[in-house]
Amino acid sequence: MNNLYRDLAPVTEAAWAEIELEAARTFKRHIAGRRVVDVSDPGGPVTAAVSTGRLIDVKAPTNGVIAHLRASKPLVRLRVPFTLSRNEIDDVERGSKDSDWEPVKEAAKKLAFVEDRTIFEGYSAASIEGIRSASSNPALTLPEDPREIPDVISQALSELRLAGVDGPYSVLLSADVYTKVSETSDHGYPIREHLNRLVDGDIIWAPAIDGAFVLTTRGGDFDLQLGTDVAIGYASHDTDTVRLYLQETLTFLCYTAEASVALSH
């Protein structure tokens, strides 16, 4: 048994398998950041912080001594509770193929959104600076007319190249912007195809973000550091329900300020 305490949950192996499958499917469907940043191997439950490699000057304890603190970034634990019906869980053992796992999917979607917003917008309470505020490139404005979006993306790519940032490059679009470029054509040619010709990486649906981001995916510029990856744990139960949660521990580091361009409405 570990500190997820899953062995204490009144959940059969077959039900666990379905719950985990729904959680994994939903999380992967909504997550975008992990497709464009480096993801370090999980350090394990004992990992409380990651080193930045920097030193911080501190007052020496006595004359003739130079003192420094090793700078580090603490990991934040993100937990999303959800509740399942015991009848829905037990129905799996009786052969049910349509148990209601909507609470699982809602929790997985929420955790994916929180992780992506942490990566792109930052999380000041957890000492995490996001890609938007860390970027040293001037932010660009997304036009209202989707037919003008390729020109702005091209401008963002030029900013990256002029800053000496090599590709491949990817573009992340919020849900509304992605819909616009997918549904709009210019002289019979889909805007999405215009973007595909400009970008040598991926055009990514990123529902958690606002606006868009253009960044390099060459590696070494952005790092999602995990203590424990996404997992399901047990909280409690009664005669009718089982209370579980999705959880991960992480921090995020931006190493190269010039490796991204943010686009806002």
Curated annotation (Swiss-Prot):
Keywords: Cell membrane, Encapsulin nanocompartment, Membrane, Secreted, Virulence. GO terms for cellular component: encapsulin nanocompartment; extracellular region; plasma membrane. Gene3D superfamilies: 3.30.2400.30, hypothetical protein PF0899 domain. It is found in: Encapsulin nanocompartment; Secreted; Cell membrane. The initiator methionine is partially removed. When isolated from culture filtrate isoelectric focusing gives 3 bands, none of which are glycosylated. Disruption phenotype: A single enc deletion survives less well after 3 days in 2.5 mM H2O2, pH 4.5 (mimics growth in the phagolysosome). A double dyp-enc deletion mutant cannot produce encapsulin nanocompartments, cells are highly sensitive to H2O2 at pH 4.5, mutants exhibit significant dysregulation of redox homeostasis, survive less well in C57BL/6 mouse-derived bone marrow cells and are more sensitive to pyrazinamide treatment in infected BALB/C mice. InterPro entries: ENCAP (IPR007544), Encapsulin_nc (IPR051429). The keyword Phosphoprotein does not apply. Its main location: other. It is a peripheral membrane protein. Belongs to the encapsulin family. Family 1 subfamily. Stimulates a strong IFN-gamma response in memory immune C57BL/6J mouse spleen T cells, recognized by monoclonal antibody HYB 71-2. Multimeric. The encapsulin nanocompartment is formed by 60 subunits. Monomers form pentamers which assemble to form shells. There are 12 pores where the pentamers meet as well as 3-fold axis channels and dimer channels; none are larger than 3-4 Angstroms in diameter. The N-terminus of the protein is inside the shell, the C-terminus is outside. Shell component of a type 1 encapsulin nanocompartment in situ; its cargo protects against oxidative stress at low pH. In situ and in E.coli assembles into proteinaceous shells about 22 nm in diameter with 2.5 nm thick walls. Cargo proteins are targeted to the interior via their C-terminal extensions; empty intact shells can be isolated in E.coli in the absence of cargo protein. There are at least 4 possible cargo proteins, DyP (encoded in the same locus), FolB, BfrB and Rv1762c; DyP and Rv1762c have been identified in vivo. This is Type 1 encapsulin shell protein. It comes from Mycobacterium tuberculosis (strain ATCC 25618 / H37Rv).
